[in-house]
């Protein structure tokens, strides 16, 4: 039975996630066959879906088991839809072999250093356990959800029953970890401290690589040097307990780390792509707008602060876009992307 559960977890992470992302990216010409972008799109879709169904489920007093069943079924349906879209596209346009310029010896050395740096960070994040006061709430919340099959109905500090913790239930990232723990059969504390870095750290570097590639003028040869520079900043970024680097390395089980180290950089990446499309191609694919709205949902999943930050970031982007294009039309889909964050923000203000 434990082996079967581990296989289910691997299927979720390595098959279902990129499968969902591939269906979304099928309509984005530049990233149609980019596996890193497929993983990013897949995780954003999964987080957005979880945020969408978890908050109402928690408010209605549903169990973790019930939420997990519904979420699992929806994920499988999304995977089937994504796979069907990809298969239909392959029949329509057969894949051509992409001819790439071979790596030079210098590039290979830089890539080896970059990959070694990521591996070192993964080992440090897993082996050198970091003790943090917030774990008393977040990790315990995941543990209580799995143990008692309830969500935000028990106090994590003394395990006493309580009324619904509405403030924290608007950002149910600990419940997503509880779902993965329940799926794999691994204790929530072990999963939080050991496996979450193995999931979020590689994803974060995929995002940094995708963003760096664009910032460097799509020059592939400079990308490994960019990643090495990012690794140096992250490895020596623990100048306080509140930096994005500290959250990424040592607090990946907390939703704040998801927000600052993964979702916000992903939003910058999507906004950079959208800006390029709207300024030069005059039109952006609908899938990009969909991914941006999913990123807003994902920001709320990580932290209620994400519900405030994401509409603000999109609003600043909209003002810059209006100044550069002198057109109001792109602001309409941008506003619809803000709506999830605005709704959760109003809800938080009302019930706080």
Task: Report the location of each language-model feature.
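Specific aromatic-rich, kink-prone transmembrane helix
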Residues: 16-17, 253-279
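Membrane-interfacial loop-to-transmembrane alpha-helix junctions, especially the N-terminal start
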Residues: 30-46, 111, 220-227, 284-291, ...
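Active-site lumenal/periplasmic loops and adjacent helix-entry segments of GT-C-fold
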Residues: 117-233, 243-251, 262
